[in-house]
């Protein structure tokens, strides 16, 4: 529903303060976007109906994060608890702020492979149709506003699994002379491979964002993220890899490893580094841009390696259970290349690597994630 007061943008002299509209504003990247763009002096309108709680259960609720944003930012933040599938409610928000909207950051999504199989209609409606609803409203009400879309490396389906990996002691790895050793680039095909139902809905959204950029000459970017992480993640088994590793370690929960001997590799990028990339695009937008965005060679780990880091930080051994079957479409190895983005935005730099990320997650949750009695 709309906020009761549904305020006009604040005035700054004779002008209105520019507005950043953030979908999924209670989530990891969404909440970081709210803080970041408020810090740049924009008013922020956040859209989030806490559907994550429906996807993953009460422990995944983002309501606590929304309350914290309101407390921290006061009048600079307005929350709208609507569903992106509700076209009428979404249109009212866009019409209300109109051309005062300076940027749209679309992070809202259904992010789980497993959940998508159970309810493919909701998955597609949220990921694909919800994205279309956002794009069309930008076109109608604030066409000059850049659209920053959080896509995923899952748009490449299981194609990365066809690469010639070697099994090492703690990880799968490519040979140093392989073209993708420094990271998979955007030239990898997203066609004719197994994506999972979730991956397919994200492909539809990804391509539609590109199409609105090209067809309507809108400023759009697709960021195909690796593992996006940080201390604000409401981590669960189905989503939130590093956060869930640390949570299981701290709460003495059993962590289930799905296939690949626990040696599957993920690159991990901190939400801070994601948002500095968003800001770079906001300041110098392009039409129909597509970039991989992840930890790259700077920040990556296998599950076994992440376990070892978590154990060193907390002083507690991981409790694990191995499941032979990997998840459908899951990557054996993913390290993405940030080279294309860094070529276009050479001032952007990464700050956080995996040990720093896990340490921060531990310190942020040490009073909350306590062992089960």
Regions found by a protein language model. Give the residues of each.
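N-terminal Rossmann-like NAD(P)+-binding domain of SDR-like oxidoreductases, especially those catalyzing
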Residues: 2, 6-228, 365
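Short, solvent-exposed loop/helix junctions and linker helices
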Residues: 23, 84, 125-128, 198-199, ...
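Short, flexible micro-motifs
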Residues: 27-33, 133, 154, 160, ...
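C-terminal substrate-binding subdomain of Rossmann-fold SDR/epimerase-dehydratase oxidoreductases
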Residues: 33, 39, 227, 249-373
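Short, solvent-exposed loop/turn segments at secondary-structure boundaries
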Residues: 56-58, 118-119, 232-237, 269, ...
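Activation loop
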Residues: 62-65, 112, 241, 245, ...
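NAD(P)-dependent short-chain dehydrogenase/reductase
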Residues: 159-183, 197, 207-282, 307-313
């Amino acid at each position: 529903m709309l906020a009761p007061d549904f305020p006009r943008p604040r005035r700054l002299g004779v002008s209105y303060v520019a507005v950043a509209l953030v979908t999924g504003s209670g989530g990891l990247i969404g909440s970081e976007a709210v803080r970041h763009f408020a810090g740049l002096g924009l008013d922020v309108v956040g859209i989030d109906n806490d559907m994550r709680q429906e996807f993953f259960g009460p422990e995944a609720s983002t309501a606590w994060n929304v309350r914290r944003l309101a407390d921290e930012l006061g009048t600079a933040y307005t929350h709208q608890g609507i569903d992106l599938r509700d076209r009428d409610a979404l249109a009212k928000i866009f019409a209300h702020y109109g051309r005062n909207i300076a940027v749209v950051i679309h992070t809202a999504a259904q992010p789980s492979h497993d959940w998508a199989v159970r309810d493919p209609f909701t998955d597609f409606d949220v990921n694909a149709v919800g994205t279309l609803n956002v794009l069309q409203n930008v076109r109608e009400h604030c066409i000059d506003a850049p659209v920053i879309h959080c896509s995923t490396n899952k748009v490449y389906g299981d194609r990365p699994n066809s690469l010639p990996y070697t099994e090492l002691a703690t990880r799968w790895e490519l040979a140093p002379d392989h073209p993708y050793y420094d990271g998979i680039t955007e030239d990898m095909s997203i066609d004719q491979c197994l994506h999972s139902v979730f991956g397919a809905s994200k492909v539809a959204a990804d391509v539609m964002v590109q199409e609105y950029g090209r067809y309507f000459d809108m400023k759009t970017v697709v960021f195909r993220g690796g593992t996006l992480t940080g201390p604000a993640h409401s981590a669960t088994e189905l989503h939130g890899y590093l956060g869930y590793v640390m949570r299981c370690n701290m709460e003495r929960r059993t962590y289930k490893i799905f296939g690949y001997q626990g040696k599957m590799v993920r690159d991990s990028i901190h939400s801070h580094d994601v948002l500095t990339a968003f800001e770079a695009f906001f300041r110098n937008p392009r039409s129909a841009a597509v970039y991989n965005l992840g930890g790259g060679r700077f920040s990556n780990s296998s599950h076994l390696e992440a376990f070892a880091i978590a154990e060193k930080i907390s002083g507690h051994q991981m409790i694990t259970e191995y499941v032979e079957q990997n998840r459908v479409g899951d990557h054996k190895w993913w390290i993405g290349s940030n080279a294309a983005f860094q070529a276009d935005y050479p001032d952007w730099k990464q700050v956080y690597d995996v040990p720093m990320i896990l340490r921060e997650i531990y310190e942020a949750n040490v009073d909350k994630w306590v062992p089960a009695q």
